[in-house]
Amino acid sequence: MTTKPTIAISHLGCEKNRIDSEHMIGLLVNAGYEVDANEELADYVIVNTCSFIEDARAESVRTLVELAEANKKIVISGCMAQHFQEQLLEELPEAVALVGTGDYHKIVDVIQRTEQGEIVKEVSQEITYIADETVPRYRTTNEAVAYLRVAEGCDYRCAFCIIPHLRGDQRSRPIESIVAEAKQLAEQGVQEIILISQITTNYGKDIYGKPKLAELLRALGGVDVPWIRIHYAYPTGLTPEVIAAMRDTPNVIPYLDLPLQHSHPDILRAMNRPWQGRVNDRIIEDLKKALPDAILRTTFIVGFPGETEEHFQHLVDFVKRHEFDHVGVFTFSAEEGTPAIDLPNQLPQSVKDSRRDALMEIQQPIAARRNELCVGQTVDVLIEQENPATGELIGRSPRFAPDVDGLVYVTGEASLGSIVPVQITAADIYDLYGTIVEA
């Protein structure tokens, strides 16, 4: 009997990529392959790459080169495989296969073909696949947290974004499928489910004829998971129905990740954002009135072609005025295959960097003030880590999403994966500190 090769998976990029990796692991394990976390011990390494911006591509390339130098058989999957295809096979002879973003479910067949000596290119030009609750999945997050993909792809064509080219048009899963997977996750002991897609507020539009996020949230209210968090909510999609569903569904956290990208109408129009110039004060003010306890995270792009000092100052004033809880700032990255790469008035990197640094400097005291409002409160904290040297516990309250926001450093005793009441005693720019409240 032939021994099956050992396989490792190197995951790079976003949560959507993570879910693809988790499905590949699940499928391979089901097929009898040993999946090892140690790349040095593996015969094959699947590198699930990111190609969203230049920095992400550089990280993917570094990983591929290091593995090639270690003489590993490399399977390149994900966004770079979709983006560059034959170019990767030509430049990296150690690559034995390419697997596109709509083809990860074929990973077992791909490995079997490479074992026979074939160089495999499994990259669909029309990307239509989305995994459901029946596809094996091995989660790589900590046991208490899981990402749940409600849709894949995007129907918008923002000038700076290559995602529709890499992941296809939007395709949503039926509500019943999502609820079924949420119940599976609850049975596994998951305490927090994070709903993701490219534009979560557009969920269902492609299969139901109109967005159905409100109905999905209400359906998920019946699942025994304490926290459900929404990522990537477009402000114009936060309809009264969605806001009412958030208010009425106790396990839906009032946390909103709003990818606003800019405030000035000129720049929003140049970006071809779906709301064009309609991100204004009223939208944010109405949202805060409707959800007064909402935790608001947003991201901005500075240095977009044609952004003047006046445009940038408009954004600075917008950030000062609305005091978001969490802000991420990215410099514009000109991506091949997007309209923005050909726009006039491209800005030097030095200007982009200085604007990013200036905006973050303005946001930091705002973030500190928002965190300081928690001092004296008792908040629920999901315990995720323990510092073995000090015994200090580390977790997150509802105001912090994994990886992108802060942490809560906790004194006291609690089991990993449990949610406990913590009295907040101190705060800084990013994190909170507190003590477990004994019952």
Swiss-Prot record:
Domain Radical SAM core: start-end pairs: 140-369
Positions of the TRAM domain: 372-438
Catalytic activity: L-aspartate(89)-[ribosomal protein uS12]-hydrogen + (sulfur carrier)-SH + AH2 + 2 S-adenosyl-L-methionine = 3-methylsulfanyl-L-aspartate(89)-[ribosomal protein uS12]-hydrogen + (sulfur carrier)-H + 5'-deoxyadenosine + L-methionine + A + S-adenosyl-L-homocysteine + 2 H(+)
Gene Ontology CC terms: cytosol
Cofactor stoichiometry and binding remark: Binds 2 [4Fe-4S] clusters. One cluster is coordinated with 3 cysteines and an exchangeable S-adenosyl-L-methionine.
One of the GO BP terms on file: tRNA modification
Chain ranges of the MTTase N-terminal domain: 5-116
The protein's Enzyme Commission number: 2.8.4.4
Keyword set includes NADP: no
InterPro entries per UniProt: Elp3/MiaA/NifB-like_rSAM, Methylthiotransferase, Methylthiotransferase_CS, Methylthiotransferase_N, Methylthiotransferase_N_sf, NA-bd_OB-fold, Ribosomal_uS12_MeSTrfase_RimO, rSAM
Record's keyword terms, sorted: 4Fe-4S, Cytoplasm, Iron, Iron-sulfur, Metal-binding, S-adenosyl-L-methionine, Transferase
Residues bound to [4Fe-4S] cluster 1: C14, C50, C79
Needed cofactors: [4Fe-4S] cluster
Cellular localisation: Cytoplasm
SUPFAM superfamilies: Radical SAM enzymes
HAMAP family in UniProt: MTTase_RimO
Family of this protein: Belongs to the methylthiotransferase family. RimO subfamily.
Role of this protein: Catalyzes the methylthiolation of an aspartic acid residue of ribosomal protein uS12.
Protein name: Ribosomal protein uS12 methylthiotransferase RimO
Lineage: Bacteria, Bacillati, Cyanobacteriota, Cyanophyceae, Oscillatoriophycideae
